[in-house]
Amino acid sequence: NHPSTIWTRSSSQHYDWLFRLFRMLSAEYSMRYSNGVFKVHKSWEKLGKLLETVPKNIEDNGWEDPPQCMPDYCKDNDVVTAYRNYYIKEKSYFAKWKFINQPDWYNEGLKNANIRL
């Protein structure tokens, strides 16, 4: 019963948004790692069709932003800003961008937080 799973099943809009994110992350994986031979991530291969339809027991209860599951000092009124803060302040030791450049928001955030990798 993690806050994110509670959020996901609290509205069909949340479930659908998360499924679309899953689809986009799978496409990102294929773009980055195919390298001449098209690759599909195993999770998409096994679960894509299965999870595509919102379960019947999840009603449309409108939209709320996803929960901010992070230390309070990373949180922000804007959920995207909060998760960016979290990656900069807590996850920079492992965050990697293979085959693409790091996003500008990440580089700027590291500089502002005075974090050197």
Short names for language-model regions:
Residues 1, 5-117:
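Sequence termini and other peripheral, non-core segments
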